[in-house]
Design a protein with these regions (language model features):
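Amphipathic alpha-helical packing segments from all-alpha helical-bundle domains
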Residues: 45-52, 75-78, 94-120, 127-132, ...
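Short coil/turn segments at alpha/beta junctions that flank glycine-rich nucleotide-binding fingerprints
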Residues: 3-7, 58, 79, 118-119
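Amphipathic alpha-helical segments used for helix-helix packing
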Residues: 73-95, 139-146
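Hydrophobic alpha-helical connector segments
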Residues: 38, 52-78, 129, 133
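C-terminal effector-binding regulatory domain of bacterial HTH transcription factors
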Residues: 171
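Helix-turn-helix
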Residues: 2-34, 38
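Short, basic, alpha-helical segments at the C-terminal edge of helix-turn-helix-like DNA-binding modules
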Residues: 11, 41-47
Length: 171
């Protein structure tokens, strides 16, 4: 799916790459859409686990947010198909697409709420904040992780965390 897109991907090729017979493929999945949904769910879970580990390892929430920006750019560089597969899911399997972002936003908002409880950030609508930060990270990952790898992720993370922590207010 990552190389050719959903519509050009063939079950025979998927089975060949997975080193299974086509009949065995149908033991686990009843259609190409079913395997695509499973792939979206799997990639989504892998992404959430990777970014959660980065946040948890940080000394505080703002340091964690900065680390997540850099880590997400690196994740996108190593998993270039992720952006394409998730974007395609909007058209192929809207339920998987929405589930990906809904789970991500809910876990992110819960994590922000915990950080507020520890006194690491201000109060506010954590769900709105989660969606805003996720949106920023998605486009930073696309631009600097998938389209062009020349920028240093640390530099991008510095600019991103400045926006998160200071906003656009003049200093």
């Amino acid at each position: 799916f990552g190389e050719r897109g959903y519509h050009d991907a063939a079950i025979a090729r998927i089975a060949q790459l997975a080193d299974v017979a086509i009949g065995s493929f149908y033991t686990y999945f009843d259609s190409k859409e079913a395997v695509f949904r499973a792939l979206v769910d799997s990639m989504s879970a892998e992404l959430r686990l990777a970014m959660t580990a980065v946040i948890v390892a940080a000394p505080d929430r703002l340091a964690g947010e900065r680390a997540v920006i850099a880590a997400f750019i690196e994740f996108c560089r190593k998993n270039k198909a992720l952006s394409r597969i998730i974007a395609e899911a909007a058209f192929v399997s809207e339920d998987a697409y929405r589930r990906h972002y809904d789970k991500l936003a809910k876990s992110y908002a819960a994590s922000l709420t915990k950080a507020f409880g520890r006194g690491e950030m201000s109060d506010g609508d954590m769900m709105v904040r989660a969606w805003a930060i996720i949106g920023m990270n998605i486009f930073l990952g696309l631009r600097f992780g998938v389209w062009d790898e020349s920028a240093d992720p640390a530099h991008i993370a510095d600019a991103g965390i400045a926006l998160i922590s200071e906003g656009l207010r003049p200093r």
